[in-house]
Design a protein with these regions (language model features):
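N-terminal Rossmann-like NAD(P)+-binding domain of SDR-like oxidoreductases, especially those catalyzing
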Residues: 1-203, 337, 345, 351-369
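Short aromatic-enriched loop/helix-cap "lid" or pocket-rim segments at secondary-structure transitions
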Residues: 56-59, 154-157, 208-211, 275-277, ...
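Generic alpha-helical secondary structure signal
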Residues: 54, 92, 146, 182, ...
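Proline-centered turn/helix-capping motifs that create local helix->coil transitions or kinks
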Residues: 132, 143, 150-156, 192, ...
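Short histidine/acidic/glycine/proline-rich micro-motifs that form metal-
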Residues: 50, 202-205, 235-236, 305-306
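Residue-level recognition of oxygen-bearing side chains
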Residues: 80, 111, 118, 209-213, ...
């Protein structure tokens, strides 16, 4: 157990009742695992619409436990949100629910505006009313989990994004997240609602839906399918292991200041092609049943994503200095853990490779202009 995790166990004992939106999704489910493990006395209510990327089985470890409850529903449903806040006496919202895949946002932006902007607005309105009705308690928190993509794209020479970097989103996805960030910030400045925003870099780890880069490559290796790499493969991303992200969010809820924004990054800038080659080497080492070996032979360059941001990089010195958080898992260790998880959990991802997923995959990677 690292020092930050030890530190968390010593937080003053104030029981929290959390509403975790999108808790059946990738980051949300990992956060629920973290919170229920570290704070078993707290109550956790998950609200998730169970869209294609939400999977109730991600939360199987907690189903039936006294302090855990799952509710299927939409964050845009104001009466449902009101009912949950009042009935369950929620004091903390951890807001993960979002449409999050850039390629899908290019194919169909409407769902992104609806969930990410209107959904966040609905939660803010409901939580503001609830907070006021309870006498505006100091310990209430609205944590809005967002992305570094709101800052736009960097050249290889630019300094990393800080919390002061101006917003310049380039995709319908990042524009919708930027819109939601602005609403959250406005509710703090206008109404003093105790909101906090976090902007993270690319997450990876267990329970990530197969459309995302790292699980996509692992699964395609196992199926002997091409490993599609956009453009020239030189796009750079900063990779954050999801467990490290959850530790940071824990600290932000307990010690972060309302009205503040915290950037959360892994300090792991890697070119896409280098990442794919690292994954190929891990698959060759760890998987016994590869149809094609070496896996690197499957790498196929495909037409670049529309408006593909060249580089993301996060300066996470604020959260390091103010809250004492730094990432504990190196990209080498994190990738190994992740590959091992996908190899051991085929029964988790195989049902997700549905006809709809295949149609979407073909549309993105095989329809070359």
């Amino acid at each position: 157990v690292n020092s930050v995790e030890n530190q968390q166990l010593n937080f003053p004992v104030t029981r929290r009742t959390l509403l975790v939106t999108g808790g059946a999704g990738f980051i949300g489910a990992n956060f629920v695992h973290h919170w229920c493990t570290v704070y078993p006395e707290d109550r956790v209510i998950v609200l998730d619409a169970l869209t294609y990327a939400g999977n109730r089985s991600n939360l199987a470890d907690w189903e039936g436990k006294e302090n855990f409850q799952f509710i299927q529903g939409d964050i845009c449903d104001r009466s449902l949100v009101d009912q949950i806040l009042q009935t369950e006496a929620i004091d903390t919202i951890a807001h993960f629910a979002a449409e999050s895949h850039v390629d899908r946002s290019i194919l169909g932006p409407a769902a992104f505006v609806q969930t990410n902007v209107i959904g966040t607005f609905t939660l803010l309105e409901a939580f503001l009313q609830h907070w006021r009705a309870r006498g505006q308690p100091d310990n209430y928190r609205f944590l809005h989990v967002s992305t570094d993509e709101v800052y736009g794209s960097l050249t290889t020479d630019d300094p990393p994004f800080t919390e002061k970097t101006p917003y310049a989103p380039n995709s319908p996805y990042s524009a919708s997240k930027a819109g939601s960030d602005h609403l959250v910030r406005a509710y703090y400045h206008t109404y003093k609602l105790p909101t906090i925003i976090t902007n993270c870099s690319n997450n990876y780890g267990p329970y990530q839906f197969p459309e995302k880069l790292i699980p996509l490559m692992c699964i395609n290796c196992l199926l002997g399918k091409q490993l599609p790499v956009y453009g020239d493969g030189q796009n750079i991303r900063d990779w954050l292991y999801v467990g490290d992200h959850c530790t940071a969010l824990d600290l932000v809820i307990h010690q972060g200041l309302p009205g503040e924004t915290y950037n959360i990054g892994g300090n792991n800038e890697v070119k896409n092609i280098d990442l794919v080659q690292m994954l190929c080497q891990l698959m060759d080492e760890l998987a016994v049943d590869l149809p094609v070996r070496p896996s690197q032979e499957l790498i196929t360059f495909v037409q670049d994503r529309l408006g593909h941001d060249r580089r993301y990089a996060i300066d996470a010195s604020k959260i390091a200095t103010q809250l004492g958080w730094t990432p504990a898992v190196t990209v080498t260790e994190g990738l190994r853990r992740t590959v091992e998880w996908y190899l051991m959990h085929r029964s988790w991802w195989k049902p997700l490779l549905s006809k709809q997923y295949q149609e979407y995959y073909d549309k993105v990677y095989l329809t070359q202009k």
